[in-house]
Amino acid sequence: MKKPVFFLLTMIICSYISFACANISDYKVMTWNLQGSSASTESKWNVNVRQLLSGTAGVDILMVQEAGAVPTSAVPTGRHIQPFGVGIPIDEYTWNLGTTSRQDIRYIYHSAIDVGARRVNLAIVSRQRADNVYVLRPTTVASRPVIGIGLGNDVFLTAHALASGGPDAAAIVRVTINFFRQPQMRHLSWFLAGDFNRSPDRLENDLMTEHLERVVAVLAPTEPTQIGGGILDYGVIVDRAPYSQRVEALRNPQLASDHYPVAFLARSC
């Protein structure tokens, strides 16, 4: 009789520890500028994006810039998020990577901000359904919004800074910091990844000018992330996030765009 009780107690303790220690570094995260455009986008979603998400090695969360339209096989759930005063909607879809009899569902959170060409839209694909969805208003009239999903106390966001040097890159980080400084948000850990169109060194200098360098850490790969050279795709993590120093950025070799995907994975202890 003692063994079953001991086993049950052990399971409860392990479950509690697992829940209590859940943090951003527990997730396999990736960002990718898809260079989306019409028919080619559908192919990239069904081939390249699917590869990044599938199997045990697949990422848990994929941030997509220039996402184009969602794949035609994605099914709208009816969940429509449009925060008051922001005016930028996000729609939730389910996307089955498996078969009808053996489903493998992912959740797509898609923001159709490019109502004309439908090319430079933003999307986040998640293995888990989001508890919350966030939209941070654009930093300038020309800028794009920051969108994000919340899984428990962890928030994953993506952004696409303006071309020609990412003049709004630092403002994107500042707006994100200020949003999560609100009293009702301070308990959350957040991670922002995307195409900043600016080198990580330059962004770090910008953050130092604004005295924000101690609030966040920039996580960037050491290899160029764009075909023309330059490291433009990387992440920014709030320093209060548990185990934030354990996460490293690595360039993925897949090339079906003018940008490489960049993965953020926990370093081995």
UniProtKB/Swiss-Prot annotation:
Alphabetical list of Gene3D superfamilies matching this protein: Endonuclease/exonuclease/phosphatase (3.60.10.10)
Superkingdom of source: Bacteria
GO terms assigned for molecular function: endonuclease activity; toxin activity
EC number(s) reported in the record: 3.1.-.-
InterPro entries reported for this sequence: CD_toxinB, Endo/exonu/phosph_ase_sf, Endo/exonuclease/phosphatase
A Pfam family of this chain: Exo_endo_phos
GO cellular component, one term: extracellular region
Enzyme class, broadest EC rank: hydrolase
UniProt cross-references to PROSITE patterns, sorted A to Z: PROKAR_LIPOPROTEIN
Keywords, alphabetical: Endonuclease, Hydrolase, Nuclease, Secreted, Signal, Toxin, Virulence
Locations listed in the record: Secreted
Signal peptide positions (record): 1-22
Annotated consequence of substituting H160Q: Abolishes cytotoxic activity
Inducers of expression: Expressed only on infection of host cells.
Any further remark recorded for this protein: Unlike other pathogens possessing a CDT activity, S.typhi does not encode CdtA and CdtC (that form a heterodimeric subunit), which are required for the delivery of CdtB. It means that the CDT activity of S.typhi is strictly dependent on CdtB. Both CDT activity and expression of CdtB require S.typhi internalization into host cells. S.typhi is the only Salmonella serovar that encodes cdtB.
Described purpose of this protein according to its UniProt entry: Produces a CDT (cytolethal distending toxin) activity, which causes DNA damage in intoxicated cells. This damage induces G2/M cell cycle arrest, chromatin fragmentation, cell distention and nucleus enlargement.
NCBIfam families for the chain: PRK15251.1
Protein name, as recorded: Cytolethal distending toxin subunit B homolog
Organism: Salmonella typhi
Gene of this entry: cdtB
